[in-house]
Amino acid sequence: MRYPIRIAFAVAALALFAADPASAHHMMGGKLPQTFTQGLLSGLGHPVIGLDHFAAIIGAGIIAALIGRGFAPVLAFTTAMIAGVMLHVARADIPAAELLVGLSTAAIGLLIVLRSGFGVLPVAILFALTGLVHGYALGESIVGAENTPLGAYLAGLLVIQSLIAAGAFAATRFVAARGVSFGSVAVRTAGAAIMLVGGAAAAMAAGLAG
């Protein structure tokens, strides 16, 4: 088995242990953020401790680099993510949100693996829908918070996700610049890892693993 494929399967194995939908949205140990600082730290931490969220935003950065049209996928994802958080805060209901989070993450990975022609509008729509369900899931830990920690939480989410996506964008461009063949293998391997992380999260949400 080729080394990059081993990496992809190693990430998938990690996902089975780390992508716990219940724990991935409680940066403050299950406690509601009460201050600006707590809200900010919670927002900064959630996309990192939730492996499915982390993988999805990396995927947004990779696809942004591949389509060559700037940060459209990232902007679509982050904007819709804020809307998703606010939907949860408003007590709206998105059925099977955790399952949708996993499936949407897997779809992003599959899109990277296939690398068929990316249309900006279809990609933006995909990431808007993905961001909505991811934001809804992330909003679980902030429901009931006052405006100050809520605003700080949203700011933290925007900052950390923008940084993660920018890093993935830069890494993809750097890898691609080293040669078409190497870039293709590396990018597809990353896509496979993202797809497997999403699949593992979806399986856990559906009660098929864990």
What are these regions (language model features)?
Residues 1-52, 203-210:
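Histidine-/acidic- and/or cysteine-rich, low-complexity loops and terminal segments associated
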Residues 12, 186-206:
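Final/C-terminal transmembrane alpha-helix of multipass membrane proteins
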Residues 24, 50, 106, 132-134, ...:
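Divalent metal-coordination and catalytic microenvironments
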Residues 44, 54-64, 112, 123-131, ...:
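Generic transmembrane alpha-helix signature in multi-pass membrane proteins
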Residues 61-98, 147-175, 187:
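A small-residue-rich subset of transmembrane alpha-helices
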Residues 87-98, 113-118, 140-147, 208-209:
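Membrane-interface helix caps and helix-loop-helix hairpins in membrane proteins
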